[in-house]
């Protein structure tokens, strides 16, 4: 069947998807559905999604556009937009992420600021800014009015003011962890002479946060470009060990904590990847390949196995890769290519995101995929799955229609989560838009972007 895309607010209707010939000869993602949760004129991007481990039919999805949110009570078949997440006392909010804790509370983490500093040299001339967390006690329907500051510069006139950027929130939901229920946030701090990674923790359901600590042994350059530190992401193992990765120049940096985030091992570079900022990707204003990390929670021979995924140019075009560790990150396997198109075909796969199913241990990776277009422009969404510990990946077509951007800003990331064979991905696609409100005189109208949630159900599959 043809993929029908329907937009409806505030209740957003399901987009039925029985994918026909998606991604040429790829098998269809089983039970695939795609739901739009934003309007083109909102130009949404940089989304995040989470599933409630206590009630897996509850899903929260958030996206950039002043920290907007939507919730679902039917396993992402439909979504309703939530109110009360946009911080009215700040000009801009973005870089959103979301998670549920082990009690079923939802959390929205975001960056808020009034103005940026010098372009790409954000700490130079920065205005007031900060990292904040907002809570929902009812699965994302309503959100507490007062957000809690993790770290903030509330006046913009503080001495030695820095710029806090790209926060990511995650929770310890491992049943046997001594720190179960704890929340963690990590982010980049741009300073005048360097970039570093900071980390904070909460042991009281996000009511208060610890004083941030630096977890990056090596500092990056102070510009938001190749050579800086970028792309913090963290996860928790079955014993409560925290694993964290980010891009450090042309490498992936890794560190871990065994005491609930109070202290971290010295960070070290583990995998050479090339620079994480990709230029000259047709139709997209910028693309980044920074890594993600996940852990197998189950027992057995793969219990506690740590996985990393990223994308880079080692084969000429952009490909997606994965590696794994069975010894808590001390040693790593050789990289495995996740996308299954021909090697050196000149067609890009980019903006990957990974999730490890905490129930089944299956590894999932989503990415934008251009394998069907010899011109390397038409873009679809592909979902890859590994059930053999990351040794091989089967690629599935998640969408059957492509989009072609005109230097669209899709953000710096997508997101993916999985629970008990059900997979939930979220991404942005560019679409034409007639709104010319934000168009400069003499230029064509800016294209819009729509945020989509894709679901797939691998129940009964091995």
Enumerate the predicted regions with their spans.
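Bacterial N-terminal signal peptides
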Residues: 8-18
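Extracellular, repeat-based ectodomains that mediate carbohydrate processing or recognition
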Residues: 23-462
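Positively charged n-region of N-terminal signal peptides that target proteins for export
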Residues: 1-6
């Amino acid at each position: 069947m043809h993929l029908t895309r329907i937009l409806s607010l505030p209740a957003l209707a399901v987009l039925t998807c029985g994918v026909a010939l998606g991604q040429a000869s790829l098998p269809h993602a089983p039970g695939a559905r795609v739901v739009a949760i934003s309007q083109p004129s909102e130009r949404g991007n940089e989304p995040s999604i989470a599933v409630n481990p206590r009630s897996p039919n509850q899903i929260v999805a958030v996206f950039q556009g002043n920290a907007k949110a939507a919730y679902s009570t039917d396993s992402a078949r439909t979504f309703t937009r939530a109110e009360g997440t946009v911080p009215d006392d700040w000009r801009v909010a973005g870089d959103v992420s979301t998670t549920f804790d082990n009690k079923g509370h939802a959390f929205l983490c975001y960056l808020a600021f009034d103005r940026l500093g010098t372009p790409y040299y954000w700490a130079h001339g920065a205005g007031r800014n900060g990292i904040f967390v907002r809570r929902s006690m009812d699965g994302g329907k309503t959100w507490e009015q007062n957000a809690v500051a993790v770290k903030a510069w509330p006046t913009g006139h503080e001495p030695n003011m820095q710029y806090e950027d790209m926060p990511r929130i995650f929770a310890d939901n491992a049943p046997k962890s001594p720190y179960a229920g704890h929340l963690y946030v990590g982010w980049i701090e741009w300073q005048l002479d360097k970039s570093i990674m900071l980390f904070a923790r909460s042991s009281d359901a996000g009511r208060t946060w610890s004083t941030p600590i630096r977890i990056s042994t090596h500092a990056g350059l102070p510009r938001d470009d190749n050579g800086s530190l970028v792309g913090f992401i963290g996860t928790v193992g079955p014993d409560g060990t925290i694993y964290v990765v980010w891009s450090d120049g042309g490498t992936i940096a890794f560190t871990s904590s065994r005491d609930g985030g109070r202290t971290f091992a010295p960070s070290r570079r583990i995998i050479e990847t090339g620079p994480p900022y990709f230029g000259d990707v047709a139709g997209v204003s910028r693309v980044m390949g920074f890594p993600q990390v996940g852990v197998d929670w189950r027992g057995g021979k793969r219990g506690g196995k740590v996985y990393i995924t990223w994308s880079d140019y080692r084969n000429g075009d952009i490909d997606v890769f994965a590696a794994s560790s069975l010894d808590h990150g001390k040693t790593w396997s050789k990289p495995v290519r996740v996308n299954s198109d021909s090697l050196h075909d000149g067609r890009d796969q980019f903006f990957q995101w990974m999730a490890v199913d905490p129930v089944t241990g299956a590894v999932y990776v989503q990415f934008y995929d251009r394998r069907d277009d010899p011109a390397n422009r038409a873009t679809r969404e592909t979902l890859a799955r590994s059930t053999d510990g990351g040794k091989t990946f089967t690629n599935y077509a998640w969408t059957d229609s492509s989009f072609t951007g005109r230097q669209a800003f899709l953000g710096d990331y997508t997101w993916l989560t999985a629970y008990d064979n059900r997979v939930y991905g979220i991404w942005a696609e560019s679409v034409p838009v007639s709104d010319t409100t934000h168009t400069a005189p003499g230029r064509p109208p800016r294209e819009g972007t729509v945020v989509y949630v894709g679901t797939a159900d691998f129940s009964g599959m091995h």
